[in-house]
């Protein structure tokens, strides 16, 4: 995924899709692995639960931002996109996310961890059945080369900031969600994503002040 010379809000869409896709894949594979083998350490269980909670929070906030801000704006610019279908798919995902929340809390607190992980794995796989076709539609209709020419650079930048702030307000806690966002991207993409955050977040809060709180998630994140 290359960064264009000019701002392009569609590139933000691709990056958040990459973050969520990796989060889904990691949570799915690890839930199956730990259901079979158990958690090697208590800290691994804590980290997995934090990672799964962050995944749910980020996906929920992303779809709220699309429903409430992005799609109403883009309907005027790209009227042929299947917005009603995409919103209906979001609603399907909301119901599954509710199930994932329940299963994650069972993993966090319940004594039957293997059974809870197996149930979580089933629900995560059902997310994947909707998620992958869903983002395929979005990325076809809202490709950077289509969205880029529709808006001046300042408007791309304004929307990028608006969408990011809306997602931030609807997700959390920040000390888990921000590292989840940054470190589910490879380093070359992380650089571009981090530029949209305040320096105090990327240079002080994440690496220093929040470090102990998100450290248990480290095994599930990219270096």
Where are these regions (language model features)?
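Small-residue-biased structural context
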Residues: 1-223
């Amino acid at each position: 995924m290359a960064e264009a010379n000019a701002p392009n809000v569609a590139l933000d869409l691709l990056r958040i899709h990459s973050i969520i896709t990796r989060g889904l894949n990691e949570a799915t594979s690890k839930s199956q692995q730990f259901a079979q083998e158990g958690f090697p350490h208590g800290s691994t269980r804590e980290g997995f639960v934090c990672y799964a909670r962050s995944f749910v929070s980020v996906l929920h906030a992303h779809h709220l931002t699309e429903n409430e801000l992005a799609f109403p704006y883009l309907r005027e610019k790209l009227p042929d996109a299947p917005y009603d279908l995409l919103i209906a798919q979001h609603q399907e995902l909301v119901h599954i996310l509710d199930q994932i929340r329940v299963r994650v809390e069972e993993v966090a607190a319940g004594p039957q961890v293997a059974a809870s992980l197996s149930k979580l794995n089933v629900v995560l796989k059902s997310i994947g059945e909707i998620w992958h076709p869903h983002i395929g539609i979005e990325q076809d209709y809202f490709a950077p080369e289509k969205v880029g020419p529709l808006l001046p650079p300042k408007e791309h930048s304004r929307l990028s900031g608006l969408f990011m702030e809306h997602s931030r307000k609807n997700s959390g806690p920040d000390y888990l969600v921000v590292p989840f966002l940054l470190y589910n991207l490879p380093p070359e993409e992380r650089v571009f994503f981090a530029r949209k955050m305040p320096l105090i977040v990327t240079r002080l809060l994440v690496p220093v002040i929040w470090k102990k709180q998100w450290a248990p998630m480290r095994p599930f994140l990219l270096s």
